[in-house]
Amino acid sequence: MRALKILTFTFLIFHASGQEVSLLKLCTHCTCSEIPDIDGTHLVLNILCSELDKVDDLADLDKIQWPDNPNGLKISATFEGLGLTTLGKLPPNTQVETLRFSSNAITTYWPNPFSDLPNLKILSFSQNEIAALTPDLFTNAKNIEDLDLSYNKLTHISPLDFKNLQRVKKLNLQNNALGKFPVEALQSMKVLEDLDLGKNGIIDVLLKRAKSEGLKGVKRLNLSGNRIRSIVKDSFPDENNIELLDLSNNVIEVIEEEAFLTCTSLRELNLAQNNITFTFALPSTLQIAILRINTLYHWPQFPPGITYIDLSYNRLSALYDETNVYFDNLEVLNIGGNQIKEFELQNKLPRLFSLDISYNIIAEVPKCISSQNFPTLEELRLDGNPIESIYFKNIIALKNLYMNDMNRLTVVEDKAFSNVIGRAGDEIEFEKTCFSLFLSNCASLREIQGAFDGTNLCMLDVSKNNLTHLSRTLLEWRNLNEGANLQFNPWNCNCDMQWVIKDLLPQMYKTNSLLLSELRCGSPRAYEGLRLVHWYNWTEEAMCTDVYDSGNYQIAPSTIKSSQISSLTLILAGCIIAALLVATALSVYLVWNRRRHKVRQAALKRKRQSALDVREASGHEQFSALNKV
């Protein structure tokens, strides 16, 4: 019996070895190419297998055959959108450095699937169905530096799962179902720098008490889109190197006064879209502060090195106290969407290039807006304020000026923008400067007078207003190198607007024809809704005709002489007359035929009635005879 078992086992071995294993050549079914790497420093052999490739049996990744690589290039392979549910063990290759299995349905995997890929550094399982990890997934993948497990279904991570990943610098766990910060699981990642835990279900951050080597080197920490309600003194460890901290899109209501002071390297802090009401202390190293969409009533105390402040859509009612701040390094200030009535500054902001005070309740253009106070300003936003009259009192140099959504503005008066000049860039230092003006969606704006005397515009946007007339002398239209957006206005297409077709329309057609698609007439009635581009290249002055009176139009008498009537016109007229004659004859025939049909029907009806009367009379006589008998 024992000899029989040995013979059977030997037969199976020889039978299996005699069969040839069919390997799947990747470059036959997928796209293989030599491309520069992400840094552009050297070439890599890129293999892309996507849902567009008709690949059979690719679920058995252990049966793939790596392509020949005579130049010894590093290999980057992507298996994307193939519907993979199980990850098999990949065949050996020492040149594979990047593997991506994104947008599949992977739930399980073979033990040690990467044990024969000793130089694997970048691994992505983004957008799969992984609900749990086991230590044997990364047992022999000790060189991984970038691991992406985002958009899976992980609820818990054990310290043993990552115990072999000691060289990971970037870890992405975004959009899973983690209920708490996986501090213990990061213990082995001693060189971790970038950690993304956004869009999970984390409710608190208490890292100060955690003794984890994996958190000491973290420079970028993303906790956005969680359920964090408060930030306290114990939220971050004393010795941390966090430079970028994102806590946006949480439900934070309380931040303790000194909660961020342990972050001595913090440069960027994002607290947008929370419920923060009270201010707190900020570290002295902070340069970028994003606090938009909160409920702050007062300005935080920003450090001297601050360069970017976004306090838009809070509840601020006044500016900061100039005696207690130092904004010499400030480059961007966004306080739009607040309740500020007055914008008056005494101190200069020497480096500010973008100022947004839109959607407040400022009733006039601030008098402090000048090149003296803002010597480097490039972009100014005044949108949505209840400004009724525009006038810049002092000279200001800009590249872009935004004054949209001003519902109380009815007329832009003379010299409104005379003190606004263009700001030269480095590339056009010695050329004539210009600025772009966006004055759109002002529902009551019906007239623009000599507002641009002494100015030079690059682009003018007066779309979606209530303008009916446009003066030829309003500005130097030829200098608008970026075009003019005149769309969605009820233009009165009369002779005074003929110059638009003659001069402005050809210029816009060549430079930016997209700005002509909704450039239409609003009056007179005959032209209502007609696009002005309809008259492009017309030799006649279409808007200067006298045939339209009070919105009602008449057909103008023909000016064509009889000798100029072409044969085609005669043929067409003859066809129309013949068609009318045929139609008339057919109508007469149908009427006559219908009358004849009615007469025949009436005669037939009378005949049937007579026959019926005869039968009834005969029956009555027979009945009478029987009674007599």
Regions of interest found by a model, annotated:
Residues 2-629:
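Extracellular leucine-rich repeat
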